[in-house]
Regions:
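A preference for well-ordered globular domain cores
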Residues: 1-145
Length: 145
């Protein structure tokens, strides 16, 4: 079950996230391993004072590379961090729940997207869920999308 949960978590992380940028549009960014490393490079460029940071939208090699402003790239890297951290935290809470199960029936109730009982939620997951609730979400199943 832990392998199933890990696989779903990794798939969700890699599929990426959406973020609204200064143009008012929602943009999608993938989080393949090379994307995650490149986001770190972008943060270094921001800290060096770069004002135009090149990136291929959605990790695509079929679209032209474009420049993103420092503010937009900061939004992108912040969203990337939140996306990865939330899903890793949620996955770890699911695995704690898996460890606590005593029957096959209980184990079957656990899947990626299930609401983790509060007993198995880390403090970090509780904080993420509370923040999600305050902006209109209601539970993990919405948050893990």
């Amino acid at each position: 079950k832990k392998q199933e949960v890990n696989a779903a978590c990794n798939k969700t992380i890699v599929e990426g996230f959406d973020v609204e940028l200064s143009d008012g549009q929602i943009h999608h960014f993938t989080m393949k391993e090379e994307d995650q490393i490149a986001f770190l490079t972008c943060l270094a460029l921001i800290s060096k004072g770069e004002t135009a940071i090149p990136w291929h939208p959605n990790g695509s090699s079929t679209q032209p590379c474009v420049f993103y402003s420092t503010d937009d790239m900061q939004k992108i890297t912040d969203a990337a961090y939140e996306h990865r951290t939330f899903h890793t935290t949620y996955c770890n809470s699911l695995k704690i729940w898996v460890e606590a199960t005593e029957t096959a029936e209980e184990l079957q109730e656990i899947y990626y997207g299930a609401d983790v009982p509060e007993t198995y939620q880390s403090d970090v997951l509780k904080a993420y869920l509370k923040a999600k609730e305050s902006v209109g979400g209601t539970d993990e199943s919405e948050a893990v999308r």
